Amino acid sequence: MTIAPITGTIKRRVIMDIVLGFSLGGVMASYWWWGFHMDKINKREKFYAELAERKKQEN
């Protein structure tokens, strides 16, 4: 009685690595975009809006 060889292990591992890589990459990119980038952009936009309001009041 022989045991059947295990097949498809490398293919499964490669697919799992690719899926995991894209998933983690997407999560980290989303965190960077919404957690860091948009915070900086909102601060900059707020500064320029206040600056424009001050210039508008001076004139």
Swiss-Prot record:
Residues 57-59 form a propeptide. CDD domains: CcO_VIIa_fungal. Pathway: Energy metabolism; oxidative phosphorylation. It is found in: Mitochondrion inner membrane. Residues 2-8 are mitochondrial matrix. The chain crosses the membrane at residues 9-44. GO terms for cellular component: mitochondrial inner membrane; mitochondrion; respiratory chain complex IV. Residues 45-56 are mitochondrial intermembrane. InterPro entries: Cyt_c_oxidase_su7a_fun. GO terms for molecular function: oxidoreductase activity. Signal peptide: none annotated. It is a single-pass membrane protein. GO terms for biological process: mitochondrial electron transport, cytochrome c to oxygen; proton transmembrane transport. It comes from the Eukaryota. Keywords: Cleavage on pair of basic residues, Membrane, Mitochondrion, Mitochondrion inner membrane, Oxidoreductase, Transmembrane, Transmembrane helix. Component of the cytochrome c oxidase (complex IV, CIV), a multisubunit enzyme composed of 12 subunits. The complex is composed of a catalytic core of 3 subunits COX1, COX2 and COX3, encoded in the mitochondrial DNA, and 9 supernumerary subunits COX4, COX5A (or COX5B), COX6, COX7, COX8, COX9, COX12, COX13 and COX26, which are encoded in the nuclear genome. Present with 35500 molecules/cell in log phase SD medium. Component of the cytochrome c oxidase, the last enzyme in the mitochondrial electron transport chain which drives oxidative phosphorylation. The respiratory chain contains 3 multisubunit complexes succinate dehydrogenase (complex II, CII), ubiquinol-cytochrome c oxidoreductase (cytochrome b-c1 complex, complex III, CIII) and cytochrome c oxidase (complex IV, CIV), that cooperate to transfer electrons derived from NADH and succinate to molecular oxygen, creating an electrochemical gradient over the inner membrane that drives transmembrane transport and the ATP synthase. Belongs to the fungal cytochrome c oxidase subunit 7a family. This is Cytochrome c oxidase subunit 9, mitochondrial. It comes from Saccharomyces cerevisiae (strain ATCC 204508 / S288c) (Baker's yeast).
